[in-house]
């Protein structure tokens, strides 16, 4: 199953034809047509049709870029959402309030049937869960160890977790994530690594703070995240740049790969006076993969 490019994943309200039309020119790697939080209760059913029509119309132009965030599996909307939006052109489902990997397996079985009905090749529709939005989910993060069908990445969220536990804020007085959310961030990274998929960082809420977003993305990439959720169209380009390796990083990575290719039996090498061993080779290959 091929990897999707997930540096930037932009939410677009699925009930807004104007915003959907405008999103087609956005540089985000993935557009997430949102049926959950950004759509009012009274408009959810209609938004399904709007989303499905948009996917069908844009299938060729936006190939492998269209996801839908459905409503949580334990709501009355989830199955109807899936039945409406699994059409040719859909690349993936973002699953909010995922409780454990068991939810991914359940969703995957549903997608098996819906792909067959829609004439879509088996396994086409991938899944990105939001894996930290409830206390139960936090305690089940170890369930993502190993290969999971359709899993394309794992992301995390702070807002719903705050509401569940009754936190007044998810930041300390100095503006840093408080310990619970630092844990959620770290568990997302570890779960994604254990599952062999990219970890996608949560959104930067202040869409006017471009400098803060860029700094947060750079720090996130240093920690191991491969992309970030965007809540505003202007964030996509900033996110893409931050999660893409620089020319200097690519050149250094290529030197490491070339050095080991020239001496395949070596356990460690010296480059510019620095000892380089197999973990450095792994990181170099990952860096080159990011630019592919």
Kindly give the residue locations of the regions a language model identified.
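Expand to "…catalyze enediolate/carbanion chemistry for C-C bond making/breaking, isomerization
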Residues: 1-292
